[in-house]
Curated annotation (Swiss-Prot):
Family: Belongs to the OMP decarboxylase family. Type 1 subfamily.
Protein name, UniProt field: Orotidine 5'-phosphate decarboxylase
Pathway it works in: Pyrimidine metabolism; UMP biosynthesis via de novo pathway; UMP from orotate: step 2/2
Source superkingdom: Bacteria
Residues at which substrate binds: 10, 32, 59-68, 119, 180, 189, 209-210
Record function comment: Catalyzes the decarboxylation of orotidine 5'-monophosphate (OMP) to uridine 5'-monophosphate (UMP).
Subunit and partners: Homodimer.
EC number(s) recorded for this UniProt protein: 4.1.1.23
Source species: Pasteurella multocida (strain Pm70)
Length: 233
């Protein structure tokens, strides 16, 4: 598996999601399962995706006391997911305990990444929750904390990639939502970029939802996006 595309499965019903999944090739993408689908369908849905040979990013953004988050991360590892995330704003100790609990899994441990600042948030949104910093400043602060905790990477907007690469180095994974092929609607994302632009900026993985899942021919759109990506990244 070398694809940089993670398809976001944002559906209300299992049959709708599996209809899409059965149209696309697991060698061309991974799949993201978020709060809505996981709350409704649970672990059996993740297992159904695994049975179809897809790697799964379990996007539940854990944020709780350290012991609770660590146990949740361990449950994700037992489920066999490829990647799982938590909120960096939960603090250093929370992230360190989550990372430590994965040690017994060795090379089979999922990638553990953090969410810094949601891509829907702008300066005013941060100010309204008491953070007197720009999204970029807060992202850098939380990405540095994430790296200090030993996690594998962060979710970040494409506009933040270059500065995070400079701050965190080439081995720190950068997972980028807010990806919209040319001509797509921005939806609820505020900081967006095309797939090729994000890879050129230094993203490792691109999270793409509606441009693929709502396409008339999802398989062809997925192939087209993969073909558009720079080959030297």
């Amino acid at each position: 598996m070398t694809s940089k595309i993670i398809v976001a499965l944002d559906y209300e019903k299992e049959e709708e999601a599996l209809c899409l999944v059965d149209q696309i090739d697991p060698s061309l993408c991974r799949l993201k399962v978020g709060k809505e689908m996981f709350t409704t369908l649970g672990t059996k849905f993740v297992k159904a995706l695994h049975d179809r040979n897809f790697d799964v990013f379990l996007d539940l953004k854990f944020h709780d006391i350290p012991n609770t988050v660590a146990r949740a991360v361990r449950s994700a590892a037992d489920l066999g997911v490829w990647m799982v995330d938590l909120h960096a704003s939960g603090g250093l100790r929370m992230m360190e305990e989550a990372k430590k609990i994965l040690e017994p899994y060795g090379k089979d441990a999922p990638l553990l990444i953090s969410v810094t600042v949601l891509t829907s948030m702008e300066d005013l949104d941060l100010l309204q929750i008491g953070i007197n910093a720009s999204p970029m400043e807060q992202v850098i602060r939380l990405a540095n904390l994430t790296q200090r905790a030993g996690l594998d990477g962060v979710v970040c907007s494409p506009q933040e990639v270059e500065i995070l690469r400079a701050n965190c180095g080439k081995d720190f994974k950068l997972i980028t939502p807010g990806i919209r092929p040319i001509g797509s609607d921005f939806g609820d994302q505020r900081r967006v970029m095309t797939p090729a632009g994000a890879i050129q900026a230094g993203s490792d993985y691109l999270v793409i939802g509606r441009p693929i899942t709502q396409a008339d021919n999802p398989a062809e759109v997925l192939k087209s996006i993969n073909a558009s990506l720079p080959v030297n990244r």
